[in-house]
């Protein structure tokens, strides 16, 4: 029968390395989304039933365009961090690396497409 201390049981399991920084980024993006999501819902909801020309004119104003762009950027950044953590915890081997690269590419591409669409409408 072996008596192991908590430290001895944890030896060899790896370190958290950048876990604190990742947690901080997720907390900041969560607070950002907590503020931006209601703003986005109210600005998008206001323009939801408008005719096309009125909606384009509405999003040509700076406030709705900025709220939309910030929501896109912070939302996709938060998505990337959360899904990357999920993949790192539950997927192993080559699939892990491929899924992380795919997630990063998807999140940056979707954020860029969303920002491009809003900027194109705003200008």
Give, region by region, the residue ranges found by the protein language model.
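Membrane-embedded alpha-helical bundles that constitute the cytochrome b-like, heme-associated redox core
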Residues: 1-123
